[in-house]
């Protein structure tokens, strides 16, 4: 992680950690950098960069700032307007853009925002290019073998254009519809759009596939994104599914790159369940290349043991769909993801895609002719407790001798019946304390003891 960009982009409270000037300068650098790359290869056409945004009030401000920077540096800015992160990746790859930018802070509250950078292949931007962006933000850029106090502006006809590209978003919707192998006619499907990016996309996809689609939290006002809604507040969808006799419910986050499910009984279906359900189906259909499912260190022990029982290999990466995708690409894997609902189907997408994930879960339900509850009940999840402690210094809090002592004590109590994972958040000032164990009471006790030690040592904010 860099000074500004974490595991999922440059994120912070709007006009505090992340300002309009930051966005303008990110645009200035990217417009110049891709133009310079072209010029050095004998191509004097303007770079083309596609931009999407979520429904936060500040997203419009950051969009204008990015466009100002891009066009001032000679790049053409193509605007998808309010759309999902995976749609930006899709359009960047399909339409040959130099890169893509998504303005979103994902599942964070409305007052936060972020800038996610996507390369021309629809993948998250490489760390070397991000390091150059950060160097320019800090005013000491070394690039192309030169030191730049400032990068040049475009002039006259070289100033970039701004292009309305809502058709790109529409092509993404059409692509999702084309992936539907089954009619959903007769199915009652509930969608929680988190008052975010999926509000005007997800229903269109399910309606086109014949579902009776019931939608909640699809009235964004700029201030209500993720507020008691979406994949991080799934209780409302659980109640809605049961009360409205739905077959299944799907909850997306603010930029719809993740999805969690609710079965017909109102039970939450996590990313681990989705990996198990889809992994088993893909093995049966011969689609699971390498016979491997890629998860992260946060995935439940129950998932790994269930996959092993099915004869499916598993791999663990660091937390972050970026790392999952990197492993999948290097090892030619087709399915990977996170417990939080970032699920990657690499045959169809280069990033986590919540709407695609919901379609794939429906595909398994239709193919197996089973309810989601029946499919999920074959996976036994170990009790898991997660406590997020907001801290002054993430690294120092983790390294504290007393905290390390508390971690070792918990590991001794658990033995081989559970595990402890303490890690820093990649996007927020948090230390995440996670404990799993067969015994739920012991799990909760160990987790609270570690979290309390962090607080007692004075690290908590």
Residue ranges of model-derived segments:
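General beta-strand structural signal in soluble alpha/beta enzymes
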Residues: 5-6, 51, 77-82, 102-103, ...
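Proline/glycine-rich low-complexity loops and linkers
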Residues: 131-173, 178, 264-337, 344-345
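Short glycine-centered, acidic/aromatic-flanked micro-motifs in structured strand/loop junctions
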Residues: 52-54, 191-193, 263, 347, ...
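Phosphate-binding and adjacent anionic-ligand microenvironments
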Residues: 248, 285-461
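An N-terminal, well-structured beta->alpha segment
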Residues: 1-68, 72-73, 162-189, 395, ...
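N-terminal small/polar loop signature for handling phosphorylated ligands or for N-terminal nucleophile
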Residues: 40, 48-112, 204-262
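Gly/Ser/Thr-enriched, mixed-charge loops and adjacent short helices
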Residues: 13, 113-241
């Amino acid at each position: 992680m860099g000074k500004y960009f974490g595991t999922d982009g440059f994120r912070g409270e709007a006009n505090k950690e992340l300002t309009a000037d930051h966005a303008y300068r990110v645009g200035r650098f990217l417009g110049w950098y891709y133009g310079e790359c072209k010029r050095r290869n004998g191509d004097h056409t303007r770079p083309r960069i596609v931009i999407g945004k979520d429904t936060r009030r500040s997203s419009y401000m950051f969009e204008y700032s990015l466009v100002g920077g891009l066009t001032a540096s000679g790049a053409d800015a193509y605007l998808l307007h309010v759309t999902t992160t995976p749609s930006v990746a899709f359009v960047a790859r399909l339409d040959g853009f130099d890169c893509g930018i998504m303005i979103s802070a994902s599942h964070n509250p409305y007052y936060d925002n972020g800038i996610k950078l996507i390369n021309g292949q629809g993948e998250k931007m490489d760390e070397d290019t991000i390091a150059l962006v950060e160097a320019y933000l800090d005013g000491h850029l070394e690039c192309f073998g030169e030191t730049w106090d400032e990068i040049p502006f475009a002039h006259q006809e070289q100033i970039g254009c701004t292009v309305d590209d809502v058709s790109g978003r529409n092509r993404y919707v059409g692509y999702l519809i084309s992936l539907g192998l089954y009619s959903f006619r007769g199915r009652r499907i509930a969608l929680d759009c988190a008052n975010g990016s999926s509000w005007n996309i997800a229903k269109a996809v399910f309606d086109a596939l014949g579902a009776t689609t019931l939608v909640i939290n699809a009235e964004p006002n700029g201030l209500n994104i993720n507020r008691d809604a979406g994949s991080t507040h799934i209780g409302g969808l659980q109640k809605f599914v049961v009360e409205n006799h739905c077959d299944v419910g799907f909850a997306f986050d603010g930029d719809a790159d993740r999805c969690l499910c609710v079965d017909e009984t109102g039970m939450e279906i996590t990313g681990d369940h989705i990996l198990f359900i889809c992994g088993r189906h893909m093995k049966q259909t011969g689609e699971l290349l390498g016979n491997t499912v890629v998860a992260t260190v946060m995935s439940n022990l129950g998932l790994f043991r269930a996959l092993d029982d099915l004869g499916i290999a598993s791999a663990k990466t660091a937390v972050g769909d970026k790392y999952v995708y990197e492993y999948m690409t290097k090892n030619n894997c087709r399915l990977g993801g996170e417990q939080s609902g970032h699920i990657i189907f690499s045959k169809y997408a280069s990033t986590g895609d919540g709407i695609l994930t919901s379609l794939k879960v429906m595909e398994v339900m239709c193919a197996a002719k089973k309810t989601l509850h029946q499919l999920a009940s074959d996976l036994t999840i170990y009790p898991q407790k997660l406590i997020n402690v907001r801290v002054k210094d993430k690294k120092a809090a983790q390294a504290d001798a007393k905290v390390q002592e508390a971690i070792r004590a918990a590991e001794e109590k658990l033995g081989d019946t559970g595990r402890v994972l303490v890690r820093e958040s990649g996007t927020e000032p948090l230390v995440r304390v996670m404990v799993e164990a067969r015994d739920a009471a012991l799990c909760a006790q160990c987790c609270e003891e570690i979290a309390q030690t962090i607080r007692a040592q004075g690290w908590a904010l």
